Structures are given as structure tokens and as C-alpha cells.
């Protein structure tokens, strides 16, 4: 089980990312557009740099939805590899079963 503070911090980061996502995308589009003037591009870069560090989506960590484990995360199931194995053995994941050949 991950520390409650780490899980809470990650949830807070998700909220900050969602709050700044639209403006962040607008600024990045201005910066990438080749027809933008140098002055506008520079202003957009400055505004992007003034945004909070946690507004960047790369700072959000994928965590197990059950216990917050940060490693071994499987996107398809939204849980860690350990939890996925336990759930599969209990038959809680439809269509998933232990393979044998």
C-alpha cells in the first residue's frame, strides 16, 4: 500500500493538469505554429513557463486504483501486475484466465 500522502498528491496533480490543460494546449499550439511572430512565440513561452510545474501531464503518475502502487501498472486494467494476478485468480476479470500450453 502506497503512502496516503503520495496518493493524495497525485490526485491533486491530476486536478491541476485538468485545470490548465486547455490553456496549455493553446500556448503549445502558438509556439509550434511556424506562422507565429517571434514576439508572440516568446510571450507564449513565458506564459507557459509561469504556469505551475504540476500543470504538466508528465508529472502525473499512473497508480493502482486499489492500493496506489506506482510500479507495474497495467493500463488496460487500471491496476498493478500484483493486483491483476490476484483478481484473475479469483475470476474477477472477465475473459482473463491462466494460460497453459
UniProtKB/Swiss-Prot annotation:
It comes from the Bacteria. Keywords: Ribonucleoprotein, Ribosomal protein, RNA-binding, rRNA-binding. Binds 16S rRNA, required for the assembly of 30S particles and may also be responsible for determining the conformation of the 16S rRNA at the A site. Belongs to the universal ribosomal protein uS14 family. HAMAP family: Ribosomal_uS14_1. Part of the 30S ribosomal subunit. Contacts proteins S3 and S10. Residues 46-72 are annotated as: Disordered. InterPro entries: Ribosomal_uS14, Ribosomal_uS14_bac/plastid. The keyword rRNA-binding applies. The lineage of its organism: Bacteria, Bacillati, Actinomycetota, Actinomycetes, Mycobacteriales. One of its GO terms (molecular function) is structural constituent of ribosome. One of its GO terms (biological process) is translation. NCBIfam families: PRK08881.1 (NF006477). One of its GO terms (cellular component) is small ribosomal subunit. The keyword Lyase does not apply. This is Small ribosomal subunit protein uS14. Residues 61-70 have a biased composition (Basic and acidic residues). The gene is rpsN.
